[in-house]
Amino acid sequence: MIYLDNAATTPMSAVAISEMTKVMQETHGNPSSIHSHGRQAGKLLREARQDLALLLGTKPQHIFFTSGGTESNNTAIIGYCLRHQNRGKHIITTAIEHHSVLETIDYLVQHFGFEATIIQPVNQEITAQQIQKALRDDTILVSTMYANNETGSLLPIAEIGHILKDHPVAYHVDAVQAIGKIPIHPEELGIDFLSASAHKFHGPKGVGFLYASTGDFDSYLHGGDQEQKKRAGTENLAAIVGMVAALKEDLNDQVEHYQKLSALKTTFLEEIAGLDYYLNESNHQLPYVVNIGFPGQKNDLLLLRLDLEGISISTGSACTAGIVQTSHVLEAFYGSDSHRLTESVRISLSPLNTEEELKQLAQTLKNIIGD
């Protein structure tokens, strides 16, 4: 069995499992309780927040624990926009965002009268100049991803952040696919809100965090004073500890992992050099996602045949799995009538993958396409 769908989710690291198990076995208190068991849990929660803040180059009060990327995106977008709608109701985002951003913004448009400008990519790129040209006097939020979940394309976050410093506009970045893979320090990049999800960097599912430079946003969940009164509900302490442990491990080996994944991608492409294929990517890319198409090969059938051979890849975002639809990202890149929409598959790597696995994938593709 070969797992090559790491942009959907990653296997948990042994360190994260060990740290979580220890918490589940030894720490039973509610972090909000004032007795000794609660204080013990509260201490672990504070330490996890401090450690995570240190990894991001910020302060603990800027870290809010959530259930994952989707909740973090919703909290930042809805919480900030509803708090500041008296200043304006214009939002800027891009056509290649994750559905948890696009549909959240659409919710504000449909139910609260907001207006959204959706930036379209040009030559598979989103530029800071496009964002700048879209700014209006009533713009209150810009929301972009750091790295695209389907293609691995990188957006010019630092450049956008620099431009927005001169405007009374908050900048939200969905960093779910980038964090742990490249250095990210939100304060240096001019980011006001940053979303992340643990299961994308070998942590547990169902936990994530939101970095917020300010507490000037409305609570998304109500009924308790947890997370500095911004996220009601008892914190998932074991998962939070596991998440921080996983991120520490990924960041410690970040350079080595980047080099390894770049080499694995190169090896794979060399192995399939004899096949007719094309890549769906931009000039600025993360190496761990390979969005590739083979002319004349339907992606759903190719996916099935690889699955029968014990190889797991995908056709795009797992959040729309089971729904028969083409990629909105590739549609934005190439148009709704492009053959790439029905031919392209996503191969996404992690440091746990090996050169032998990529060679086996290449040989299996040659066997299938050569039939």
Predicted features, each with a name:
Residues 1-371:
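Pyridoxal 5′-phosphate
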